[in-house]
């Protein structure tokens, strides 16, 4: 796998003994250590049903994604008309009775709404030609109740009786959110955390584990994906009424990771552990999974952008530095289960730019949700978070399909500027801001793999931090406020900087000045710019 991807990306080598963080300053990068290939990536989450319809049935499909690959990445790093993402996360593509696909009928077959396995292999090949990795959603916690395995288990067929979790009498406890988890069937009860239509696998059954291992092997070896996004990891193995982050779940996850590493040492495992940073980071720190999604951090960015105050972001970023192996967490703003960013921010494009800038200039592995880059709107129920991609201003269909209507009505705004076509015509659009930020991250190894140091800013509405590598230092300034900032002064503690004499703006407009650095590497009363505009981001190389 890595050999395929090395044509486009390279491992980022970190300098010896860089100090990471601001407050703790205890974690260091090992001399000459290389970060994994995924740290060079910006991933893009796609709900296949809603991205592009290629055959006119009103539903998105795999061939539709192939048709739109040039929008995502045209394969030429020197161009700027594509988005520039370098990884795709496909939400479930397996055969399923539901629109969302998280209740799987057949783990080795493609949902016919989306195409065929040959179509998926063609998409993977086309993506790899552009240097784009492809990972797929994998649901190991539960299946569809319509999966043949469940009926065989209910009937007690040999080899399947304990495939799911059964009880002769209702154990009586409820789920973590107070929901019913024990469901009657044939005079007995089965456990289904996410509802009666999605019974949980019995992952303490070696036969189930062996089957799921072989499914992972099939997708990595036979299909050729570059990794797996694991759904609902914290719920894998229950211990009585304890249903989240159990010791048994950690053990099962660690064993799966070891198996996957044997199959493909370069495969990425990224997990959904919808918990606080402390619980989520345990899976990575223990070597049980490569990355987990950072839900606390995502919330801090949106809260900070919405309140025009980066204080919470700074606190969370420092916590990530302290809790995770360096850079080994997946950052994002929102996903398919959450209200869309622009809806959370009440249509404020300036705040959306602040959120995007924070995400794409910070450590970690960033993930975008399709349509986020154009400010698509969406609030629950879930179907309204997963509406068709708005490619143009065409009423009803937005360039998504040639059918009279898409499978789901559009979100508001495609005729009022929330579309790719409209924003491509506007140099100052949110889409072009995302393109520029992703290009910046792709071009600057220090943004992908450098350490992070917060700076004290005289204006609390400004998020000011350094990204540092062996021979490179970048100063990032993000004005969270809707007002201009003048007379900004920064202060850095001992060891913050080497001697620098030059300052070059590499993102944003205007000039910049270099700081006067003391012998101990500290500086104070540093005025890097004359002013920052409302919601402005400026990145400055110090040398």
Annotate each predicted stretch with a short phrase.
Residues 1-32, 543:
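Intrinsically disordered, low-complexity Ser/Thr/Pro-rich tracts
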Residues 25-136, 141-153, 158-160, 169-218, ...:
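N-terminal structural segment of carbohydrate-active enzymes
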Residues 31-43, 144-240, 247-363, 414, ...:
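Alpha-amylase-like alpha-glycosidases and glucanotransferases acting on alpha-linked glucans and related
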Residues 38, 83, 260-263, 275, ...:
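Loop/helix patches that line or flank the sugar-binding groove of alpha-linked glycan CAZymes
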Residues 42-45, 87-92, 135-136, 227-229, ...:
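Structural recognition of the beta-strand scaffold that forms the well-ordered cores
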Residues 101-110, 288-298, 384-387, 520-521:
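Short glycine/proline- and charge-enriched loop/turn segments
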Residues 484-511:
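Beta-strand-rich binding/interaction modules
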Residues 518-543:
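C-terminal beta-strand-rich structural cap/linker in extracellular carbohydrate-active enzymes
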């Amino acid at each position: 796998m890595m050999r395929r991807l090395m044509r486009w990306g390279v491992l980022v080598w970190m300098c010896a003994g860089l100090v990471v963080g601001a407050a703790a300053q205890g974690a260091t990068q090992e001399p000459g250590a290389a970060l994994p290939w995924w740290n060079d990536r910006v991933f893009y989450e796609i709900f296949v049903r809603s991205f592009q319809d290629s055959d006119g049935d009103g539903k998105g499909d795999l061939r539709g994604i192939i048709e739109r690959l040039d929008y995502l990445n045209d394969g030429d790093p020197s161009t700027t008309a594509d988005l520039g993402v370098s990884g795709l996360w496909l939400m479930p593509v397996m055969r399923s009775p539901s629109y969302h696909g998280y209740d799987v009928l057949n783990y080795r077959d493609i949902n016919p709404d989306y195409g065929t396995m040959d179509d998926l292999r063609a998409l993977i090949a086309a993506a790899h030609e552009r240097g784009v990795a492809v990972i797929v959603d994998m649901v190991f916690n539960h299946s569809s109740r319509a999966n043949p395995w469940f009926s065989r288990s209910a009937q007690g067929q040999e080899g399947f009786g304990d495939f799911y979790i059964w009880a002769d009498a209702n154990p009586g406890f409820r789920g973590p959110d107070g929901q019913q988890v024990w469901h009657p069937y044939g005079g007995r009860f089965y456990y289904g955390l996410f509802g009666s239509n999605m019974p949980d696998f019995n992952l303490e059954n070696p036969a189930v584990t062996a089957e799921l291992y072989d499914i992972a092997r099939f997708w990595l070896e036979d299909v050729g994906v570059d990794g797996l996004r694991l759904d609902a990891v914290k719920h894998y193995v229950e211990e009585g009424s304890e249903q989240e982050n159990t010791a048994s779940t950690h053990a099962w996850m660690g064993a799966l990771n070891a198996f996957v590493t044997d199959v493909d040492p370069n495969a990425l495992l990224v997990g959904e552990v919808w918990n606080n940073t402390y619980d989520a980071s345990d899976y990575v720190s223990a070597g049980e999974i490569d990355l987990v999604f950072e839900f606390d951090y995502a919330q801090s960015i949106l809260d900070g952008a919405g309140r025009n105050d980066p204080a919470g972001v700074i606190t969370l970023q420092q916590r990530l530095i302290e809790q995770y192996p360096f850079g080994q967490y997946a950052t994002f703003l929102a996903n398919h289960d959450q209200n869309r960013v622009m809806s959370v921010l009440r249509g404020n494009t300036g705040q959306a730019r602040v959120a995007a800038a924070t995400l794409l200039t910070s450590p970690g592995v960033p993930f975008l949700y399709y349509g986020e880059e154009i400010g698509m709107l969406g609030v629950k129920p879930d179907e309204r978070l997963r509406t068709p991609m708005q490619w143009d201003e065409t009423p009803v269909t937005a360039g998504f399909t040639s059918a009279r209507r898409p499978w789901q009505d559009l979100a508001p705004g495609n005729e009022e500027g929330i579309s790719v076509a409209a924003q491509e015509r506007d140099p100052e659009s949110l889409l072009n801001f995302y393109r520029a930020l992703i290009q910046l991250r792709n071009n600057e190894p220090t943004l992908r793999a450098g350490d992070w140091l917060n700076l004290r800013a005289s204006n609390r509405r400004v998020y000011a931090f350094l990204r540092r590598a062996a021979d490179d230092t970048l100063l990032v300034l993000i004005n969270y406020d809707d007002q201009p900032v003048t007379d900004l002064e920064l202060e850095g503690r001992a060891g913050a900087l080497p001697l620098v004499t030059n300052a070059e703006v590499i993102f944003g407009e205007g000039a910049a000045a270099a700081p006067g650095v003391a012998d101990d590497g500290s500086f104070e009363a540093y005025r890097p710019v004359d002013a920052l505009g409302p919601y402005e981001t400026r990145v400055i190389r110090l040398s």
